[in-house]
């Protein structure tokens, strides 16, 4: 699998790569790619590093650090994955010649896709609601783990397995919900 992905990081396929070095395969890829690589991380020094990360039901905030500058970033999409996705986006933008400042500021205007880790308006009630179209056991575990990070009390999950789509996953999804929600 890794060798198949490595083909994407050759001169025939790309001019530059933006790689998450917090991922073991990404760290390996950063060393083995045949093209210039820019790295991103929230755990170690990289070309694009996130620090002072704060996350809640309304999104994530962090300090974006490059070799030259630091910027506060806020993205109105909750979840740890948002930090990685936004770092990757900044890297892609700068690879296309967009200044890092412009890319970082644009993230604050970003809103997620409806139904993907979407924070719903609870009109001031003392709870949050996250809507997500998690339709695999892994996706359900990921969203519940994400929401658990900023849940102060109980985490209640309501999910469904629509239609006749892959009925084998249903008991697994139920088990994942039972193990990862209250």
Residue ranges with predicted function:
Residues 128-135:
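Switch II (G3) loop of P-loop NTPases
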Residues 2-128, 152:
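Acidic, Mg2+-coordinating active-site environments of NTP-dependent enzymes
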Residues 88, 135, 139:
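Conserved cofactor-binding/catalytic machinery of classical short-chain dehydrogenase/reductase
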Residues 117, 132, 157:
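Hydrophobic, well-ordered secondary-structure elements that form the walls
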Residues 43, 134, 160-162:
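Histidine- and/or cysteine-centered catalytic micro-motif in compact active-site loops
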Residues 113, 138-141, 145-182:
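Active-site beta-alpha connecting loops in nucleotide-dependent enzymes
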Residues 19, 131, 159:
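Active-site flanking residues adjacent to catalytic metal/cofactor-binding acidic residues
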